[in-house]
Amino acid sequence: MRNFPVPYSNELIYSTIARAGVYQGIVSPKQLLDEVYGNRKVVATLGLPSHLGVIARHLHQTGRYAVQQLIYEHTLFPLYAPFVGKERRDEAIRLMEYQAQGAVHLMLGVAASRVKSDNRFRYCPDCVALQLNRYGEAFWQRDWYLPALPYCPKHGALVFFDRAVDDHRHQFWALGHTELLSDYPKDSLSQLTALAAYIAPLLDAPRAQELSPSLEQWTLFYQRLAQDLGLTKSKHIRHDLVAERVRQTFSDEALEKLDLKLAENKDTCWLKSIFRKHRKAFSYLQHSIVWQALLPKLTVIEALQQASALTEHSITTRPVSQSVQPNSEDLSVKHKDWQQLVHKYQGIKAARQSLEGGVLYAWLYRHDRDWLVHWNQQHQQERLAPAPRVDWNQRDRIAVRQLLRIIKRLDSSLDHPRATSSWLLKQTPNGTSLAKNLQKLPLVALCLKRYSESVEDYQIRRISQAFIKLKQEDVELRRWRLLRSATLSKERITEEAQRFLEMVYGEE
């Protein structure tokens, strides 16, 4: 693509592509994909896009913007990279250069993370005013899209549009061509604005590019942090004291807004888990909340440097003490006691969960593990197949009624995306589950087959919508004007839509 625009400082690459479409006067999403990528199947992704090798080639004449520079300076990748380990980070970079097919989101934990982001577009009015003054146009800024943290680091709460990023899989929306809201509510949670300002350097610091501590390093970092701050008793973390320190910085209202409320009575509380052995990665937001509360004098980069500086040699484990082996008579008695408990409670698991069984199991595991494992394997109960938890027939009937209501509502509307099977399912409350189990839902499958919109029908609907719009605006009808308003071209229009166009407009 010629004259591809150069990204502005802190601009998302998504926004740069949207501006390219505006500069070239391209109104068709698929045509823009053709021009930029040479591939009509690329999905417009805001935070973690792929195919960045193509963008780097478009910007080759600038002498800048290698793939890694685009990733670290014009995507949200720096918010995930420091927390997933070096190997996974490097593999994600490789995938983002080419066709990732959603693998990057899975690899970086976005899909399974408890930190969920609102997919609606958002902006900061004060930042937009600065952009217009400096560049003469507005664009989507990276620090407006901190996942689950809709706050500008400089000016506070962001303004949301009704339109979401995934409303159209292939559409790149430009901020400069979006009507800005004049009336919007103000949020007064200054704690979250301060948190956004604390996190923002993570997006811009070149030093952070090589900082990806391992899970072992994170484990040791938090253990030492608790010890240094006196938040331990003997060798145990005082989770109540940790929670108290976090609450001194962040109110329950702020934590609930981030969906990170502290459930101290639950063993699965995220704040407890982050101070235990790390078996999985935690999000940038969880780390940042702890650091800002417990390490207020350190920047986010300095905290990362401290964790990265911990070497494997400094991670030591205590050797297990060698106990005196019991005599055979003691072992025989313990064996008999365990066998009686298993028969009494009618199962190994139930026996272990009893008060005396837990102690006895631990003793045997320590002193005669081979016998315990061998005997338990011989006396395992056959696990009965669980009863089906879902009545698929009932769900099929409920879902098909929901779909029919949606389809009926769409009949009176011309202004909606193409009603494909996947789009229709997304409009239902549990569309993802329905899509994965479609083979168990014959009524839903039949409904989708009958009512999903073909390409021809979709083009005819767009022509109808364009015709009505031009008539209402009292604009002279021309074939090219109808096609342009319907975002169609002579090359892409189907035969059926072409016949409909001739019927509406007539031969030129």
From Swiss-Prot:
Coiled coil: none annotated. The keyword DNA-binding applies. Residues 222-241 bind DNA. Keywords: DNA recombination, DNA-binding, Plasmid, Transposable element, Transposition. GO terms for biological process: DNA recombination; transposition. Disulfide bonds: none annotated. One of its GO terms (molecular function) is DNA binding. Pfam families: TniQ, TnsD. Transmembrane segments: none annotated. It comes from the Bacteria. Required for Tn7 transposition. It may at least play a role in DNA sequence recognition. It seems to be required for specific binding to a region of att-Tn7. This is Transposon Tn7 transposition protein TnsD. The lineage of its organism: Bacteria, Pseudomonadati, Pseudomonadota, Gammaproteobacteria, Enterobacterales.
